[in-house]
Amino acid sequence: MRTKTKLVLIPDRHFRRATFRKRNAGIRKKLHELTTLCDIKACAVIYSPFENPTVWPSTEGVQEVISEFMEKPATERSKTMMSHETFLRDQITKEQNKLESLRRENRETQLKHFMFDCVGGKMSEQQYGARDLQDLSLFTDQYLNQLNARKKFLTEYGESSSSVPPLFDVAGANPPVVADQAAVTVPPLFAVAGANLPVVADQAAVTVPPLFAVAGANLPVVADQAAVNVPTGFHNMNVNQNQYEPVQPYVPTGFSDHIQYQNMNFNQNQQEPVHYQALAVAGAGLPMTQNQYEPVHYQSLAVAGGGLPMSQLQYEPVQPYIPTVFSDNVQYQHMNLYQNQQEPVHYQALGVAGAGLPMNQNQYEPVQPYVPTGFSDHFQFENMNLNQNQQEPVQYQAPVDFNHQIQQGNYDMNLNQNMKHAHIPFMDGNYYNYHQPPTVGLTSTGHMPSTTTTTTNNNNNNNV
């Protein structure tokens, strides 16, 4: 680090000569810059023991500048001139003024302590003279005048703009009050300890959605909403972000083996209420509808191990009618509802075990698979795929095989028929050829009826 050079005579002659040469060139450079930048006249005459006198810019230039200077009056010439004595006198005056300022500040501080000691009853602790008491009286009057001027200013103009209220509520402080307000929606604070919500006075309706019991989650609040009805039986579910109507999920409670949904996502952009009911299907996932405009009603599905993805672009309700008379129903764990439907979709229980029924993707009419009901032991479809692009309803018939029973004729059943007197069909290997066994009273024969045919050879393979 370069240190500051002391302004003293350099004792070494050689070093002093080198310094002269360097600084002589520097001062001439500075004079050239000064005359060029400021458009002034300047000259320099330098005498030294090391070389002949040096003039700048030239001998003629020096004579011209000196002649012009001597033509000025004496007062004007000495106005900016300063000798060494004058320079020292000016420096002493500046230091004396600075010292007087410090003494005045110290005296004011001493008088202020003296004044507050008198107010506190501590006047006898120190010894004050007559001058001190006089200065105290003057200082007290000056201090009172300043206080009165400040009080008058605050009375006329109030607080300054720099004094603003705190942005956050302080613990124990009263919350602000909003008066004469028609309707204000105040979202609650999530997991903020000690925070105070603003109080709304004279308010027609304030809609505040409740908090959900989700650990560590901050759920978004639906603003500008007429009413919000939120269930309390679901966990880990996302509230609709842009809905304009209440969401009312309905969950059935009359089933014996019911497992509630663990992850249910509500409709994100719906404008009508959505009604959800339990699905009695184990291992199946039905995605929720994302952009529907009509209510969706779901009923329980009795399908074990099957997945029913909903129609993606349908405009009519899909109503598969499946029997619901089954004892062992297990609900879905993850249900994803239809994505873009505009009409309600009604689902009923499917008596199909281990089957996957993908729904129609682009249909415009309902798909109604008809399956017989009222049987205790029946063989169900393994993989039944519904029509992908149909526009008319498709009706499915379910052949059922039982041991030691052969029926004659074609068997067709739907949901609306009376199942009390239905005959159990028997399939002999041909999906389009069914036989009806003769009606024989069991009370008279004591065993199941049996028939033999010449058209079938696979009776021993039809075991349920």
Curated annotation (Swiss-Prot):
Question: Locations of Low complexity compositional bias?
Answer: 451-464
State the Pfam families in the record: SRF-TF (PF00319)
SUPFAM superfamilies membership: SRF-like
Q: One GO BP annotation here?
A: positive regulation of transcription by RNA polymerase II
Where does it mainly reside?
nucleus
Function as written in the Swiss-Prot or TrEMBL entry: Putative transcription factor.
Spell out the protein name for this chain: Agamous-like MADS-box protein AGL92
